[in-house]
Amino acid sequence: MSTLVNTTRRSIVIAIHQQLRRMSVQKRKDQSATIAVGQMRSTSDKAANLSQVIELVDRAKSQNACMLFLPECCDFVGESRTQTIELSEGLDGELMAQYRELAKCNKIWISLGGVHERNDQKIFNAHVLLNEKGELAAVYRKLHMFDVTTKEVRLRESDTVTPGYCLERPVSTPVGQIGLQICYDLRFAEPAVLLRKLGANLLTYPSAFTYATGKAHWEILLRARAIETQCFVVAAAQIGWHNQKRQSWGHSMIVSPWGNVLADCSEQELDIGTAEVDLSVLQSLYQTMPCFEHRRNDIYALTAYNLRSKEPTQDRPFATNIVDKRTIFYESEHCFAFTNLRCVVKGHVLVSTKRVTPRLCGLDCAEMADMFTTVCLVQRLLEKIYQTTSATVTVQDGAQAGQTVPHVHFHIMPRRLGDFGHNDQIYVKLDERAEEKPPRTIEERIEEAQIYRKFLTDIS
């Protein structure tokens, strides 16, 4: 009898282990996807370059890739500043329409690593992400300009290219949260770290590295960015001679978060490399090497300025109160701005921290930097909307300073000529408002927040 029981128990244990293994394998499948990184040699012939892109899409599809990453200048490489401006198009142009149709017909995401986007007398170097429906999922405009002037050489990218104004938040895709960068951005670690902090698990650096700098630094930099951010890194590259003056290094790569090279197109002129991106490995890596948990935000901090706000997804605590997400019109990493229950002047809003802490001195370095950045952004927003040139910005830091809600927050109040008989009377009104002014309705506050949110979207 005992033998039968033991055999039955062993059978049950084996069955459970087999089921767990199947579940583990299925989980890995659900979290993994095949991606392709392309390599090409663009010239000033846009039609020929498009033919190369079509060929790379075909190869990516044949390898069952759900996403193809193309290099910087996948549209063309101009032979002069004048030609570059002449060949550039807007994102609503004919070439972009062809790219979008290509993504839609093949049901594949495409990273257009750097197209020349027309912008008045200059261009933007724009990294455009298309989804499988051919829609624009995101546009990032290159931040860092390669400007060098020496006795031997004068090379100023900013003569032709207008630098971008902000980082773009990571984009949700079938292969994870993707952080968008371009070429020379690779030499700056700060954006990569910020993108990881914002949720990126894959960084992409489409490039046209020169032969000399590529040979010296390309692989080292890609692996460094992967290791320090614990992200997959994908870098599509141009290769070969584009014209008599310009040669690119090539070696399109996919790098793992551990710094291993998963794919390298080497020196093939038209090629793709593929790799399986398995996001399940990230959690294990974060647990065994929790570098981002060990960052000393009380000693140093990185802050992304002009970052576009996400649509608020949850209500926020304000001490023991709850701020309805519909009244929040801006969110940063650590702070949020919302419309006020009782206003001293029209446009009186509040900025507070996501973490509940009563005093300004209780904020860490990252929260302080983010708080003041957010306050300045909101102040500029209100002055544009209400056509004013002044604002009272104040924080009542503690009960004896007039704080009634024990959660650090700034009051931002647009000022107008003659709005108070005596300028400092605004502080008296600030203390009196709880007794004297009735609370505004939730509908009023939501409507006001929608106006501010739309304005932020439009100026972005």
UniProtKB/Swiss-Prot annotation:
Its cofactor is Mn(2+). Cleaves A-5'-PPP-5'A to yield AMP and ADP. One of its GO terms (molecular function) is nucleotide binding. Residues 315-422 form the HIT domain. InterPro entries: C-N_Hydrolase, C-N_Hydrolase_sf, FHIT, Histidine_triad_CS, HIT-like, HIT-like_sf, Nit1/2_C-N_Hydrolase. One of its GO terms (cellular component) is mitochondrion. Its EC number is 3.6.1.29, 3.5.-.-. This is Nitrilase and fragile histidine triad fusion protein NitFhit. A motif (Histidine triad motif) lies at residues 407-411. GO terms for biological process: amide catabolic process; nucleobase-containing compound metabolic process. Homotetramer. It comes from Drosophila melanogaster (Fruit fly). It comes from the Eukaryota. The keyword Lipid biosynthesis does not apply. The active site is at E72, K142, C183, H409 (tele-amp-histidine intermediate). SUPFAM superfamilies: Carbon-nitrogen hydrolase (SSF56317), HIT-like (SSF54197). In the N-terminal section; belongs to the UPF0012 family. It catalyses: P(1),P(3)-bis(5'-adenosyl) triphosphate + H2O = AMP + ADP + 2 H(+). It is an enzyme of class 3 (hydrolase). The gene is NitFhit. Residues 33-279 form the CN hydrolase domain. Keywords: Hydrolase, Manganese, Multifunctional enzyme, Nucleotide-binding.
